[in-house]
UniProtKB/Swiss-Prot annotation:
Protein name: Large ribosomal subunit protein uL6
One Gene Ontology term of the molecular function aspect: structural constituent of ribosome
InterPro entries, per database record: Ribosomal_uL6-like, Ribosomal_uL6-like_a/b-dom_sf, Ribosomal_uL6_a/b-dom, Ribosomal_uL6_bac-type, Ribosomal_uL6_CS
S-S bonds: none
Species annotation: Nitrosococcus oceani (strain ATCC 19707 / BCRC 17464 / JCM 30415 / NCIMB 11848 / C-107)
GO cellular component, as recorded: cytosolic large ribosomal subunit
UniProt similarity note: Belongs to the universal ribosomal protein uL6 family.
Length: 178
């Protein structure tokens, strides 16, 4: 059983955490602000520069929910202070990306260019034509935007062509033999 909920979340300098009575938490920092509704069976206590989590029940599901809540709030604190980024690579002949304002234009071997508009709160950088960096303060939103870009052309197993995460390992298949 994981004991992740037993570890307190430390609040760095420059991050302001507000707990309201109706189980809402607001985290505000240099990069932005996030809000989260805490489950009624989970209690969050702020003592100084740390947040502690306790369950109002001894049920296994409530303990699991306590760990999930702790992880989500830790991601919120980390996001508003440092931010998150996800790197993508374009592998394939003629596969390239370019940025036009807030719009990412991808050439992925289709008969038409694929366009992706960055949601509010996210920034997209294209340091080279085959590299994309998605940055933001909401971890879930950064990961979802990167997954949406990857979904336009996921890596195929025979040649490895497609859009992949920078740290992704594509398991290759052998071609059919006659």
């Amino acid at each position: 059983m994981s004991r992740i909920a037993d570890n307190p979340v430390s609040i760095p300098k420059g991050v302001e955490v507000t707990l309201s009575g109706d189980n809402d938490i607001k985290v505000k920092g240099a990069k932005g602000s996030l809000a989260f509704a805490i489950h009624p069976l989970i209690q969050v206590v702020q003592d100084g520069e740390t947040l502690r989590f306790s369950a109002k029940s001894t049920d296994k599901r409530v303990n699991a929910l306590r760990g999930t809540t702790r992880a989500l709030i830790n991601n919120m604190v980390q996001g508003v202070s440092q931010g998150f980024e996800r790197r993508l690579q374009l592998v394939g002949v003629g596969y390239r990306a370019q940025l036009q304002g807030r719009k990412l234009v991808l050439s992925l071997g289709y008969s038409h260019p694929v366009e992706f508009t960055a949601p509010e709160g996210l920034t997209i950088e294209v340091p080279s034509p085959t590299e994309i960096i998605v940055k933001g303060y909401d971890k879930q939103q950064v990961g979802q935007a990167a997954a949406n870009i990857r979904r336009f052309r996921p890596p195929e197993p025979y040649k490895g062509k497609g859009v992949r995460y920078a740290d992704e390992v594509v398991v290759r298949k052998e071609a059919k033999k006659k």
